[in-house]
Amino acid sequence: MEKLDKTASILSDIQMQLEELNTWKNGLVHTFNSLSKQIDDIKWHLEIDDIAEWKKIRFTGPPPSEYSYNIIKDMGGPFSAKPEPQDHVIIYAYTFYPKNLDGDKKYPLMVLVHGGIHGDFESSNADVVRNLIQQGYIVIAPEYRGSIGYGAVFYHLIDYGGLEIDDTHTARDWMLENCPQVDLERIGIMGYSHGGLHTLLNIFRYPKDYTAAYAGVPVSDLVSRLSYRWKGSPTDMGRNYGGKSPRDDIDEYRRRSPAWNAHKLEIPLLIHTNTNDRDVPVIEVESLITHLKAAGKEFEYKIYQEIPGGHTFERLDTPIAREARLEAYRFLAKYLKPENPP
């Protein structure tokens, strides 16, 4: 019996040490991500300074969701006992302006949304930003809650398809309030993958606030997506989605899914997808397309056939990628009318 007690004590000590190591490891990951973000911010100068003025700004988004708050409350997060209206989350964003900005002119605004469940706006997006600046856009790229590079608390504030969508919309509002050169009648939004989900949910929830939109390989249907993408437990499944699995709260997953909100489309929209996309399979985007058609909505889409690169095919340095981006730019330019359309 004494031997069993000693073994149990040793196992308990090992378990505690493993938990401490895991906490330490996670802390190192966020420290590394923060350093990587600072290094990448320096790279932006090399990529964009010849044609644009840019600045990283901060604004406030909505308070954390109750589920997110319960995760961060023991992490030393700057919040009171429960989320209150005054406990706004601080959001970062990148702003880009043409170098020769004319203070007496009006310019179209592009809200450019990064992808990734936990991603960030990296300098790898410089080609798209350059293209937009050359056409005559002002650009804002929000680092919505859950983005990496801002520490563990911000990482765990993620609210997939929920408050993060409001963060992106608030970035749009910030630019209107702080840049008088932005034309209120010419506001576009675009993004790839999870950025495509942001694009779609923004125009569905705030249809009067945007003029035209482009969604590339967009996450479109969380209900079907998790049925074939997720291999963890229902508890793990809900970690990024408000704490519940689809079978616990199917209506909430539909609320956060573009396909189930397609009837709200009111502005011009272009969608691209690729038949060999393994991240957002074409069947998921086809669900969105089917819902839009069933609702009698006018929109444009293109299903690319087996293009190398799969999910990232439009963001590569290949002729077909440049062609796809050009198609998106031309579509948006019809409605946003930049000074130098492609």
For every predicted segment, state its role.
Residues Y144-P342:
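Active-site-proximal cap/loop segments of hydrolase catalytic domains
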Residues E47, G76, G136, G296, ...:
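Short, flexible coil/linker elements and helix-boundary hinge sites characteristic
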Residues K3, I10-L11, K25, F32, ...:
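Generic alpha-helical hydrophobic packing signal
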Residues D13-Q15, L112, L270, G309:
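Intrinsically disordered, low-complexity regions enriched for glutamine and histidine
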Residues K43, S124-V128, T199-L200, L316:
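Short beta-alpha junctions and helix-cap segments that line functional grooves
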Residues M1-P63, P342:
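N-terminal targeting or regulatory segments adjacent to alpha/beta-hydrolase or S9 domains
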Residues I51-E185, M190-Y192, S227-Y228, G309:
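Cap/lid segment of the alpha/beta-hydrolase catalytic domain
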Residues E19-K25, N33-K37, K73-P78, V153, ...:
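Generic detector of short, locally flexible boundary/turn motifs and exposed helical patches
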